[in-house]
């Protein structure tokens, strides 16, 4: 069983905020049926105060990953309960590499994205090197087609829209 929640973590530096987003992937009745398209609903946005220590961020992310709110429980073929955490994707560009180590120390499994100025996506294990233009284009298309929607009342949504 898959978990339909995905947590995205963008790590900031001294004058740049660290931000976290929770997106729910909806399939079937809650999504468009064209070309296996899924609906993406932005459920939560969080911005950590400037200069929040990275170990504290790692602890908070680990707690969120293990929370009952975002974890799905199911049973395997042996009828044993299995807890499926949300998917975690981190921006490993810049300060992301040392923070990735902190997340691994907390036994978290995640995918890393390194944003590049290149022209093609490369994958090495769980690390994806993705051109910035591809990320921006995918975001713009998802917003314009209504595939990505923000939950009402997200306090940081207007600021995020302005920054895009």
Predicted regions: what they are:
Residues 1-114, 121, 126-129, 133, ...:
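RNase H-like, metal-dependent nuclease domains and their acidic two-metal-ion catalytic environment used
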């Amino acid at each position: 069983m898959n978990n339909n929640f995905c947590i995205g973590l963008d790590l900031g530096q001294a004058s740049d905020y660290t931000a976290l987003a929770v997106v729910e992937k909806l399939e079937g009745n809650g999504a468009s049926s064209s070309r296996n398209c899924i609906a993406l609903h932005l459920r939560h946005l969080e911005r950590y105060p400037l200069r929040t220590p990275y170990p504290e961020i790692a602890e908070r992310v680990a707690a969120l990953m293990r929370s009952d709110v975002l974890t799905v429980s199911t049973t395997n073929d042996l009828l044993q309960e299995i807890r499926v955490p949300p998917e975690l994707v981190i921006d490993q560009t810049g300060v992301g590499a040392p923070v990735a180590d902190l997340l691994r120390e907390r036994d978290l499994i995640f995918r890393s994205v390194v944003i590049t100025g290149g022209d093609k996506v490369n994958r090495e294990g769980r690390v994806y090197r993705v051109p910035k233009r591809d990320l921006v284009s995918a975001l713009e298309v998802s917003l314009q087609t209504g595939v990505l929607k923000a939950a009402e009342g997200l306090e940081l949504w207007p600021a995020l829209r302005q920054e895009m």
